[in-house]
Amino acid sequence: MILGSLSRAGPLPLLRQPPIMQPPMDLKQILPFPLEPAPTLGLFSNYSTMDPVQKAVLSHTFGGPLLKTKRPVISCNVCQIRFNSQSQAEAHYKGNRHARRVKGIEAAKTRGREPSVRESGDPAPAGSIPPSGDGVAPRPVSMENGLGPAPGSPEKQPGSPSPPSVPESGQGVTKGEGGTSVPASLPGGSKEEEEKAKRLLYCALCKVAVNSLSQLEAHNKGTKHKTILEARSGLGPIKAYPRLGPPTPGEPEAPAQDRTFHCEICNVKVNSEVQLKQHISSRRHRDGVAGKPNPLLSRHKKPRGAAELAGTLTFSKELPKSLAGGLLPSPLAVAAVMAAAAGSPLSLRPAPAAPLLQGPPITHPLLHPAPGPIRTAHGPILFSPY
């Protein structure tokens, strides 16, 4: 009973007591390695001496997630081109294509800014020449030597004076440094025209656009530019004439598009400046300037060799001898004719002359007299085979 009571009373207090919660075990103390992914690589003692491929595999397996570095975008906003490397971008920025695009954008901005500047300022009086600068309104650009507006430009300012014509005597053109033709001081805005030509890099005389000032200077020193300039002024071998006859003294000189040009070197006449430029660029004119013979004239003339010339001389020397031997009778024939004439009864008759041409004798049937009452006797037949 006592044991039973003890056994009954013993477990009851144990059941009545609340269970004691044990603190959780620290996993870091149990595990021999930490859970962080990066220090996991420290387990490999020879990690620093491993192959790069093995390092990459271990880093990918045990390491943290690799952050993908965003590739920088290299592009040109002007030309709308994307590059793969910085070297490609640098090569593109140094090229002519990028430079032309940038220059075109700057020129467009300048043209768009010029009208606004002109409208904001005071209106220029009629007939006045605007100063050279960024606020100049666009108009046909003249060439560097200041010979007036470009040929073929129909628009002219109503108040601006007409460009002065270049005299034929060449007083308006002087020689400058380097042998280039530089115009003398002309009334008007010649300096402004030169500045415009240099700023816009355009030759209105030849209608040529260049990329730099050095190219423009080289073009102005070229043969084509000088030839067209001399043709306009009439100082070179190419002369300019009015198309409808000589101008009157009071009228101004006709423009270039209303004149004809004559090239004294090639003896060619053209009707416009466009045809003149084509002729100057042709091979015929270049060969004529260089002193070469005209290929059109010498195309059908073949040079005669020394053998042909010697054969011609030999033939000309032997020709009189052969003709004399064929036309003149031989001495034996003359002697036979004289002997036959002396032995014949009709010795008083003059002996017939020997035949000029040595050949077969005349056949017998041709020597019969003509039929009729009158029959003339003929002399003896010499050298007859019958």
UniProtKB/Swiss-Prot annotation:
Cell location: Cytoplasm; Nucleus, Nucleolus; Cell projection, Dendrite
Gene3D superfamilies in the cross-refs: Classic Zinc Finger
Chain ranges of zinc fingers (Matrin-type): 74-98, 201-225, 261-285
Modification note: Ubiquitinated upon prolonged exposure to genotoxic stress, which leads to proteasomal degradation of ZNF385A and releases p53/TP53 from cell-cycle arrest target gene promoters.
Phosphothreonine modification, residue list: T248
Residues in the signal sequence: none
Domain of life of the native organism: Eukaryota
Tissue-specificity statement: Expressed in brain and testis (at protein level). In brain, the expression is located to olfactory bulb, cerebral cortex, hippocampus, satellite cells and Purkinje cells of the cerebellum molecular layer. Detected in bone marrow, white and brown adipose tissue, lung and at lower levels in the thymus.
Compositionally skewed regions (Basic and acidic residues) per UniProt: 103-121
Protein keywords: Cell cycle, Cell projection, Cytoplasm, DNA damage, Metal-binding, Nucleus, Phosphoprotein, Repeat, RNA-binding, Transcription, Transcription regulation, Translation regulation, Ubl conjugation, Zinc, Zinc-finger
Pfam families with a match to the protein in the record: zf-met
Zinc-finger is among the record's keywords: yes
Principal location listed in the UniProt entry: cytoplasm
InterPro entries, sorted: Matrin/U1-like-C_Znf_C2H2 (IPR003604), Znf385 (IPR051845), Znf_C2H2_sf (IPR036236), Znf_C2H2_type (IPR013087)
GO cellular component: chromatin; cytosol; dendrite; neuronal cell body; nucleolus; nucleoplasm
Residue numbers carrying Phosphoserine: S185
Induction: By p53/TP53 in response to DNA damage.
MF-aspect GO terms: mRNA 3'-UTR binding; p53 binding; zinc ion binding
Disruption of the gene: reported phenotype: No visible phenotype at birth. Between 2-3 weeks after birth, some lethality is observed, may be due to internal hemorrhaging mainly in brain and gastrointestinal tracts. Surviving mutants are fertile and smaller than their wild-type littermates. Deficiency alters hemostasis which is associated with a block in the formation of alpha-granules in megakaryocytes and abnormal platelet morphology. Mice also exhibit tremor, ataxic gate, tilted head, severe impairments in motor coordination and motor learning related to cerebellar functions.
Region of interest: Disordered: 88-193, 279-305
BP GO terms, sorted: apoptotic process; DNA damage response; hemostasis; intracellular mRNA localization; learning or memory; locomotory behavior; megakaryocyte development; mRNA localization resulting in post-transcriptional regulation of gene expression
Region described as Necessary for binding to ITPR1, CEBPA and p53/TP53 mRNAs: 145-351
Assembly information from the UniProt record: Interacts with p53/TP53; the interaction is direct and enhances p53/TP53 transactivation functions on cell-cycle arrest target genes, resulting in growth arrest. Interacts with ELAVL1; the interaction is indirect, mRNA-dependent and may regulate p53/TP53 expression.
Function: RNA-binding protein that affects the localization and the translation of a subset of mRNA. May play a role in adipogenesis through binding to the 3'-UTR of CEBPA mRNA and regulation of its translation. Targets ITPR1 mRNA to dendrites in Purkinje cells, and may regulate its activity-dependent translation. With ELAVL1, binds the 3'-UTR of p53/TP53 mRNAs to control their nuclear export induced by CDKN2A. Hence, may regulate p53/TP53 expression and mediate in part the CDKN2A anti-proliferative activity. May also bind CCNB1 mRNA.
Protein name: Zinc finger protein 385A
